[in-house]
Amino acid sequence: SFIGSLNDFRSYKAKLVGIPMDTDGMNMEALEKALETEKNVKFIYTIPNFQNPSGITMSLEKRHRLYELAKAHDVMILEDNPYGDLYYEGEPLPSIKSFDTDGIVIYAGSFSKVISPGMRVGYAIGPKPVLAKMTVCKQGQDVHTNIWSQVLCYRFMTEYDFDAHLAGLRKIYTKKR
């Protein structure tokens, strides 16, 4: 898991409960048990693609099961997907957010992994009230993201072939693995 996210959660006095990983993602039996026994669960944090530090990608079956468990227990999901565009082969699995019909998934992505690590620019998609609270949390960390980094990301996305750029990155990383 991303240490920055974990530290943000801790700053709000969150009780973090680790869930073991299987070869195809989070252990759903352990998650279900935690959801049944832990009190006041607010959300499930997951990195479904190339989970840090294991590198495991959650299977499609487990993505659907995670969503169903969250829905059944009235819990939101924070889907952190900084590495999702950097797959080596085949097609990427759909995000959990892509089948969210109930508005319970917050999707977070990053340009830091695909444009420049030093820029530290990310984004989130989710319910407006939750995004407003996330903005307050972000402001407590660094007031706001550097405006020039945001402008550079915007210009890169609008003036270059971003899909071709991602394909080039995948070729480079495939050779290095």
Description of each model-found segment:
Residues 12, 72-73, 103:
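Helix C-cap/helix->beta junction micro-motif
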Residues 24-88:
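Active-site phosphate-binding strand-loop segment of PLP-dependent enzymes
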